[in-house]
């Protein structure tokens, strides 16, 4: 529903229909798109570690700070991945273990949706298996590509 509301806002503010706003011409710039893949079990382990780190580094305190500054749970920013679960923990609706479990589950669902959304057969995406490539190597690929543009 947020996307529909935003689309309507744009149409009203520009006076153009959505189809009129879509450009049909090819952009006058080149695009390099990376697709990063990883064994699902490795990715899930990294997700688990990241969630634990976020809590260890003050995620709960961050949310309390946002609430103190006037943020409310009906704001779009407070519906970002994990924030509703942190909110439920803060409101004593469930314990920390359950909050982490739910955030892990939601994160895994997002991974599955992203793997479905981005096709491995899409030739406009340069796919890299992260088990065999470091971020430094990816950076080198990007720099080489940029340097090859006339």
Feature names for model-found ranges:
Residues 1-31:
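Phosphate/Mg2+-binding loops and adjacent switch elements
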Residues 27-150:
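Catalytic core of IPPT-family isopentenyl/dimethylallyl transferases
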């Amino acid at each position: 529903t947020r996307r529909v509301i935003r689309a309507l806002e744009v149409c009203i503010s520009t006076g153009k229909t959505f189809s009129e706003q879509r450009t049909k011409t090819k952009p006058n710039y080149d695009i390099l798109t990376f697709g990063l893949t990883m064994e699902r079990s490795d990715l899930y382990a990294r997700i688990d570690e990241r969630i634990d780190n976020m809590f260890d580094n003050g995620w709960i305190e961050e949310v309390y700070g946002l609430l103190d500054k006037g943020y409310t749970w009906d704001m779009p920013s407070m519906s970002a991945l994990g924030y509703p679960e942190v909110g439920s923990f803060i409101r004593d609706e469930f314990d920390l273990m359950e909050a982490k479990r739910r955030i892990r589950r939601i994160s895994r669902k997002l991974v599955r949706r992203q793997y479905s959304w981005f096709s491995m057969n899409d030739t406009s995406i340069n796919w890299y298996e992260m088990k065999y490539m470091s971020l430094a190597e990816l950076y080198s690929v990007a720099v080489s590509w940029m340097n090859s543009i006339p």
